[in-house]
Amino acid sequence: MSVEHAAVQRADFDQVMVPNYAPAGFIPVRGAGSRVWDQAGRELVDFSGGIAVNVLGHCHPALVGALTEQANNLWHVSNVFTNEPTLRLAKKLVDSTFAERVFFCNSGAEANEAAFKLARRVAHDLYGPEKYEIIAAVNSFHGRTLFTVSVGGQPKYSDGFGPKITGISHVPYNDLEALKAAVTDKTCAVVLEPIQGEGGVLPGELDYLQGARKLCDEHNALLVFDEVQSGMGRSGHLFAYMHYGVTPDILSSAKSIGGGFPLAAMLTTEKLAKHFAVGVHGTTYGGNPLACAVGEAVIDVINTPEVLAGVQRKHQQFKTRLESIGQQYGVFTEVRGLGLLIGCVLSDAWKGKAKDIFNAAEAQDLMILQAGPDVIRFAPSLVIEDADIEEGLNRFERAIAKLTS
């Protein structure tokens, strides 16, 4: 039985919502695959993926089926009890990664909060209270809680909230010498994104990530990889650390892991996990049956040779066409990234104008993303159809052509 809802419009946002977002001027109401329809029935191609979340597009049948089945059985019991979907998903993550233990939560910020707390707890338990310093990268992004925004290397997000959490420093990304100079015996963790997402879709260099691993080993520090944006097939591997062959001690995952349903996880080893004894950390909703049922369906679809190989092929399809557009119109100078996390770096003449390109794309019925003011970001579904890629890139080129005419 359908329910009749009161009509709402984009203007209502400004009347009832806290103004910390500035959403587009249209409201999406329906999605299927890599297409989205707004209230007026306009059809858009989605290259944004809900900011790298809708890893299987909109309303994928496997996810709809898993959610519907679980919704008819059990929604929530809290972590006073466990549940079957949680245990099934945890086992699949353990079987597919370096990890031996999993902590579920609801968002990337929560997963990183757990990761950073665990790193400090391990150091405290093993080496004493003086070993608590965390080193992260300039322009990194790890969430919006007070702890995670302090670890993030972007003052525009962390300033203005009173004293920041102490013991956190930042060094330039991909600068191994700077990292060597920063790490000491007081360092409890080095926190890195294998691919900086919000910082401009900047992949880590192999020798940099290998060097970080070596430094952590030499100083009894933990290597924490934030794979909130790069994980769950986005790079063409289940997790980006597999692309580099550099294994972290702790890994955070969110966004794609739930395919659009709020879900996140912290992965680690048994040896480290034991420092989170009962009551040391927790969450009410984390690992709820609905989220984990969807997460299990996500990993079942993604973690196959066909899908992961398809990501690599689709990357090349995007890269070839985007480089051609860049050469023809002179709007961007570099196409970078891994898999289906792709960034176009704007040329000097267009620096600071990513929002203009975002708006021009929307006018051509295309949903894209920014990664700061100087980079256009694409994070589409990993199973996006070739025809949708072609059509979306045609619309993108029309937007660029109109801007530059």
UniProtKB/Swiss-Prot annotation:
Name of this chain's protein: Acetylornithine aminotransferase 1
Quaternary structure (record): Homodimer.
GO biological process, one term: L-arginine biosynthetic process
Residues that, per the record, bind pyridoxal 5'-phosphate: G108, A109, F141, D226, E227, V228, Q229, T284
Catalytic class of the enzyme: transferase
Species of origin: Pseudomonas syringae pv. tomato (strain ATCC BAA-871 / DC3000)
Reaction equations catalysed: N(2)-acetyl-L-ornithine + 2-oxoglutarate = N-acetyl-L-glutamate 5-semialdehyde + L-glutamate
Keywords: Amino-acid biosynthesis, Aminotransferase, Arginine biosynthesis, Cytoplasm, Pyridoxal phosphate, Transferase
